[in-house]
Amino acid sequence: MLPPGLESTQMKQTERRILLGRIVGAFGVKGELKLESWTEPRTAIFRYQPWIVRAPSGQESVVSGVRGRDQGKNLIAVFPGVTDRDTVEAMHGTEIYVARSALPPPKPDEYYWVDLEELQVETVEGVKLGTVSHLFSTGSNDVVVVRGDRERMIPFVFPDFVKSVDFDANLIVVDWDPDF
């Protein structure tokens, strides 16, 4: 459940939104929230506002003016108008999104993972491997998970394995053995 006073929203169906984190608990008794952030660095989540928050019930609201700080393994945030622990505990599990348009453009030869999802993947020989399902990081490099006739995990490394990314063609070309 989201607290009263947060503006309800119905996002445009065409506007893509990005999941940046979630509320994982209460901190103290004055309405502060513990957040888990998936941004790099994790405090960058506070730069991208307004947030679209989605409660586990499906209720969505828009929140602006969230302040926060780094605290141990979590971030601590203060939502405008939230001043007690009970309200925060009711928000546990709430997901934090922003509109894709709220993010700055990536640097040349860098990509937001969300922009790569759903792109088609084929080899330099033209063999279709499938569609990007998701990506994950191994620490040393990112890996693109491609779902087609089977699932493949391809290191997202230029120019060794990834030869090109073409958003206009909706295509990633890779140097990859289709039997691997």
UniProtKB/Swiss-Prot annotation:
rRNA processing found in the keyword field: yes
Gene3D superfamilies registered for this protein in UniProt: PRC-barrel domain (2.30.30.240), RimM (2.40.30.60)
InterPro entries for this protein: PRC_barrel-like_sf, PRC_RimM, RimM, RimM_N, RimM_N_sf, Transl_B-barrel_sf
Keyword ATP-binding carried by entry: no
Alphabetically ordered keywords of this record: Chaperone, Cytoplasm, Ribosome biogenesis, rRNA processing
Entry's transmembrane regions: none
A Pfam family annotated for this UniProt entry: PRC_RimM
Compartment annotation: Cytoplasm
Function: An accessory protein needed during the final step in the assembly of 30S ribosomal subunit, possibly for assembly of the head region. Essential for efficient processing of 16S rRNA. May be needed both before and after RbfA during the maturation of 16S rRNA. It has affinity for free ribosomal 30S subunits but not for 70S ribosomes.
Similarity comment: Belongs to the RimM family.
Protein name from the UniProt record: Ribosome maturation factor RimM
Protein's organism: Xanthomonas euvesicatoria pv. vesicatoria (strain 85-10)
Organism lineage: Bacteria, Pseudomonadati, Pseudomonadota, Gammaproteobacteria, Lysobacterales
